[in-house]
Regions:
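Charged, amphipathic alpha-helical linker segments immediately N-terminal to NTP-binding catalytic cores
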Residues: 1-31
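ATP-dependent NMP and nucleoside kinases share a basic, alpha-helical "lid"
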Residues: 141-148, 197-246
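Small-molecule kinase domains that catalyze NTP-dependent phosphoryl transfer to phosphate-bearing small molecules
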Residues: 197-200, 219-223, 248-282
Length: 282
């Protein structure tokens, strides 16, 4: 890859509808990329480069990926984007159901194994499940047994979220490997949101210099082949606000979803030190 073409990047080409804060973060990303290539001889010798954009929902990954791709292409570096939305094994609705089932199964089983389950507990749990509040810590003060349910359920979620059980890392790594090896035509999975929407679409990698993997888990230990990991910082509150705006999920502001977001945020924070570029919020 001719890294010297990075000097031809023209930030004035950024579209007017890109928010000011996003423009600031994009400028930092470009500056850091130039510095990395200047200092890192190994990167200079790579024929093809993979950039991983990680961060929570609402951290700006999509805008960053699209803007970087636009600027790099205009500078003469052909860039393509691969989204991680198509990496999970299950369709979005089914994956949400799987997460909830693992939480509730583990929580209830813990109560049984600790001899805390009885008719009164069953009735309370069923009501909280119906109300979708069975991940709320507010109930623990008057129901000390409930902490066993929450602890076991949360542990089950921590083991599932971002794991090879939930995400098809093998598929992701195969695509990254194909790009690095110079494969010209690659079939990319399009998961869609419903069971009957799954398909594969042929992508042209023939002249691409850079692949941007835009995905929450692009900095995961299970992902192999990323040359430049970039971490976009965000908070749980920003992620929740983004989901509320999208309005794609049910029970968006429920205690269960807040638990999921908290776990994902902790995972991201634990991985961010591996990122070569970390970009904060302004």
């Amino acid at each position: 890859m001719n890294f010297q073409l990075l000097e031809k990047i023209n930030l004035s080409l950024l579209k007017d509808d890109v928010p000011v804060e996003c423009k600031q973060r994009i400028e930092i990303a470009i500056m850091e990329l130039k510095e990395l290539f200047t200092m890192n001889q190994k990167l200079q010798k790579e024929e093809k480069i993979i950039i991983g954009l990680s961060g929570g929902s609402g951290s700006g990954k999509s805008v960053m990926a699209e803007s970087l791709s636009y600027l790099l292409n205009n500078a003469g570096l052909k860039t393509i984007i691969m989204t991680g939305d198509n990496v999970p094994f299950r369709f979005p609705r089914l994956n949400d159901e799987e997460r909830l089932a693992r939480f509730r199964n583990a929580g209830t089983a813990s109560l049984v194994s600790h001899d805390l389950y009885n008719e009164e507990v069953r009735e309370k749990l069923q009501k909280w499940m119906t109300d979708f509040t069975d991940a709320s810590y507010d109930y623990v003060k008057e129901n000390p047994w409930f902490s066993y349910y929450l602890d076991a359920g949360k542990k089950a979620l921590e083991e599932y979220l971002g794991s090879p059980i939930e995400q098809d890392f093998y598929y992701c790594n195969e695509i990254l490997s194909a790009f690095k090896k110079g494969k010209k035509q690659v079939w990319l999975k399009n998961l869609g949101r419903e069971e009957d929407s799954l398909c594969y679409e042929e992508a042209d990698f023939s002249e691409a210099d850079i692949l941007i993997l835009e995905w929450t888990h692009s900095n995961s230990d299970y992902v192999k082949g990323v040359d430049i990991p970039i971490f976009l910082e965000s908070t749980v509150e920003e992620t929740l606000e983004y989901r509320l705006q999208r309005n794609r999920d049910t029970h968006i502001d429920s205690p269960f979803l807040m638990m999921v977001l908290g776990i994902e945020q902790n995972q991201l924070e634990s991985q961010k030190n591996k990122a070569l570029i970390k970009i904060r919020r302004f």
